UniProtKB/Swiss-Prot annotation:
This is Cathepsin B-like cysteine proteinase 1. Residues 1-18 form the signal peptide. Expression of the protease correlates with blood-feeding and suggests a role for the protease in blood digestion. Its EC number is 3.4.22.-. One of its GO terms (biological process) is proteolysis. Residues 19-86 form a propeptide. PROSITE patterns: THIOL_PROTEASE_ASN, THIOL_PROTEASE_CYS, THIOL_PROTEASE_HIS. Belongs to the peptidase C1 family. The gene is AC-1. Glycans are attached at residues 99, 138, 198, 296. The active site is at 114, 285, 305.
């Protein structure tokens, strides 16, 4: 494996949201739109994605502060793991690894824990893939979110996915699951917000949830020992900013974690292929990138969000591929599972 060591204090460009909007050719008046004027503009200015009139509930609580765009440590950037690999025109690991039960949509609720939730989900998928579906475990986002502080970030306020991957190497992470999941060490502690079809209603959410405390023990009533329940990684890295390198990484090892700038128009995404079109910068978000495809001659990435399975395309969304839209291809975090720890 080849690596490039980039001695950078900040890996991503430090432009303001307005500068980035201008760089993408978005008119100044379109950058300032919100509400109904924004919805009307999106519907007449593009045809790649359908627009929701109503914005995503608890939107501000689901994304991170823009400061988490900037990496604080030196990064190991991995070259294309297999430059000679044949890349298929489309790829969805759910069709390949049908026995992997880890491919489902999470719900981070009113907590900016996307960095931990997406990393835990990607690790879970990679464990299943590395073991050829023999090992099925949902890695605990809670363990990462609450115990990897301050090096990973600040829990529900946000964090850095690459640091979560490093934590997986050096500290290990226990089993987890969604809210109230039984027979796991540390399930997600924050209930889903509001109504979600026929799912259990736990109540509404107000503001950003406080970060729960770090508890280095399994929940009461679970016959697991915290230290023994841990799984470990053996490598963590940023994937080279190249469509083929990202595709090769996903083909070889499984889903990765992508981070991107979130603008006002993403608040109104319903379905289709998202491309930033209008609205101001609102924050930053981390998601699990699982595959890619093409629709009507438009290349896209296939991405699992963590805003419940009634958001977007059954919890997923697609974003235009090959243009680094919103920085989606700029900081792809990944890691290798230590199969001996499974």
């Amino acid at each position: 494996m080849k690596y490039l060591v980039l001695a950078l204090c900040t890996y991503l460009c430090s432009q303001t949201g307005a500068d980035e909007n201008a760089a993408q050719g978005i008119p100044l008046e379109a950058q300032r739109l919100t509400g109904e004027p924004l919805v009307a503009y999106l519907r007449r200015s593009q045809n790649l994605f359908e627009v929701n009139s109503a914005p995503t509930p608890n939107f501000e609580q689901k994304i991170m502060d823009i400061k988490y765009k900037h990496q604080k440590l030196n990064l190991m950037v991995k070259e294309d793991p297999d430059p000679e690999v044949d890349i298929p025109p489309s790829y969805d690991p759910r069709d390949v690894w049908k026995n992997c039960t880890t491919f489902y949509i999470r719900d981070q609720a009113n907590c900016g824990s996307c960095w931990a939730v997406s990393t835990a989900a990607a690790i879970s998928d990679r464990i299943c893939i590395a073991s050829k579906a023999e090992k099925q475990v949902n890695i605990s986002a809670t363990d990462i979110m609450t115990c990897c502080r301050p090096q990973c970030g600040d829990g529900c306020e946000g964090g850095w996915p690459i640091e979560a991957w490093k934590y997986f190497i050096y500290d290990g992470v226990v089993s987890g699951g969604e809210y109230l999941t039984k027979d796991v060490c540390r399930p997600y502690p924050i209930h889903p917000c509001g109504h979600h079809g026929n799912d259990t209603y736990y109540g509404e959410c107000r503001g950003t949830a406080p970060t729960p405390p770090c508890k280095r023990k399994c929940r009461p009533g679970v016959r697991k020992m915290y230290r023994i329940d841990k799984r470990y990684g053996k490598d963590a890295y940023i994937v080279k900013q190249s469509v083929k390198a990202i595709q090769s990484e996903i083909l070889r090892n499984g889903p990765v974690v992508a981070s991107f700038a979130v603008y006002e128009d993403f608040r109104h995404y319903k379905s289709g292929i998202y491309k930033h079109t209008a609205g101001e910068l609102r924050g930053y978000h981390a998601v699990k990138m699982i595959g890619w495809g093409n629709e009507n001659n438009t290349d896209f990435w296939l991405i699992a969000n963590s805003w419940h399975n009634d958001w977007g395309e059954k919890g997923y969304f697609r974003i235009i591929r090959g243009t680094n839209d919103c920085g989606i291809e700029g900081t792809i975090a990944a890691g290798i599972v230590d199969t001996e720890s499974l």
